[in-house]
């Protein structure tokens, strides 16, 4: 239900979709209620304070997905930040939708996470996107940066003919 809603299926069409999946009744108001609950949970996550402990490591990434914006389904970058706390647990500490992965969008996203209390970072891990690396260096000054090995492997694999990929990677 949530995925269909995010992808732009109208609340009225959701009842038809639900019926085709074997759900006997799903009204437009129920879909709206579910969407509101989801919005509230995301809002809580995005505003939750992070000053309860120090966080050592931060992983930052983006993926493009279809999002519902102004009643339309459009492609946007969902940017995420996952941090490892001193208690040894990973937490999703940042989540947002942006139009592009520009330096300005990354800087605004990271500044929001920092303003909520993220501190103590030793290492940030991300892909080699120039705007992201610059934003990380500015927002988390003094924190070391490492290129994500998964992204590096994917980038290398894309540049090597596929017959040779298995031997090299």
PLM regions and their residue ranges:
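Short, charged, low-complexity patches
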Residues: 2, 103-106, 165
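Short, amphipathic alpha-helical "recognition" segments used to contact nucleic acids or chromatin
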Residues: 1-8
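Inter-helix linker motif
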Residues: 141-158
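A polyampholytic, Gly/Pro-enriched intrinsically disordered region
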Residues: 163-169
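Short, charged amphipathic recognition helices of the HTH superfamily
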Residues: 8-18
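RNase H-like nuclease fold core
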Residues: 20, 24-126, 130, 134-142
